[in-house]
Curated annotation (Swiss-Prot):
It comes from Bos taurus. The gene is SMIM14. Residues 71-99 are cytoplasmic. Residues 1-49 are lumenal. GO terms for cellular component: endoplasmic reticulum; endoplasmic reticulum membrane. This is Small integral membrane protein 14. InterPro entries: Uncharacterised_CD034/YQF4 (IPR020309). It comes from the Eukaryota. It is a single-pass membrane protein. Pfam families: DUF2615 (PF11027). Keywords: Endoplasmic reticulum, Membrane, Transmembrane, Transmembrane helix. GO terms for biological process: blastocyst hatching. Its main location: endoplasmic reticulum.
Amino acid sequence: MAEGGFDPCECVCSHEHAMRRLINLLRQSQSYCTDTECLQELPGPSSDNGISITMILMAWMVIAVILFLLRPPNLRGSNLTGKPASPHNGQDPPAPPVD
């Protein structure tokens, strides 16, 4: 707790507020369900309508493939400028001198 008995966390999330949310949640669920059965669908997101997580992942994959194909030439790894890939033109480096 801070000085003077003031707790800044109490402004954001108080125990009373959490208990009110819990009680409201219980009251709402009691209007939909009894002890033995639920009379109708509970409110919430429906899996039949809207965009599913699979569609979102497929969209990201398509975007990734498009960005991969449209990347700039310097990131493609191909040697288009005619420069050698290694300082020894693909040959083994010379052996160090023996003393």
